[in-house]
From Swiss-Prot:
Pfam families: Ribosomal_S18
Cytoplasm recorded as keyword: no
Biological function: Binds as a heterodimer with protein bS6 to the central domain of the 16S rRNA, where it helps stabilize the platform of the 30S subunit.
Entries under Gene3D superfamilies matching the protein: Ribosomal protein S18 (4.10.640.10)
Taxonomic lineage of the native organism: Bacteria, Bacillati, Mycoplasmatota, Mollicutes, Entomoplasmatales
Protein name: Small ribosomal subunit protein bS18
SUPFAM superfamilies for the chain: Ribosomal protein S18 (SSF46911)
Similarity field: Belongs to the bacterial ribosomal protein bS18 family.
Gene: rpsR
GO CC terms, sorted: cytosolic small ribosomal subunit
One annotated GO biological process: translation
Ribonucleoprotein in keyword set: yes
Top-rank lineage group of the source organism: Bacteria
Amino acid sequence: MAMKKFVKKRKKVNFFAKNKINYIDYKDVELLKKFISGNGQILPRRITGTSPKHQRQLAVAIKRARQMALLPYVID
């Protein structure tokens, strides 16, 4: 039986805590685009590494930006 290779996973870092960002602004479109998938969906915590508090704030900011037409709902 072949041995499986062990790959050490890199610990995900909370982007907002690392950069000391307290408020996630819905008008900061470039920052919000980093947390959206290619289809336009909000990326989950397990992928981005954000804390639960910042993930909730991020989701609210992305939804506000979508309503204000700063971000698209879907990306073609």
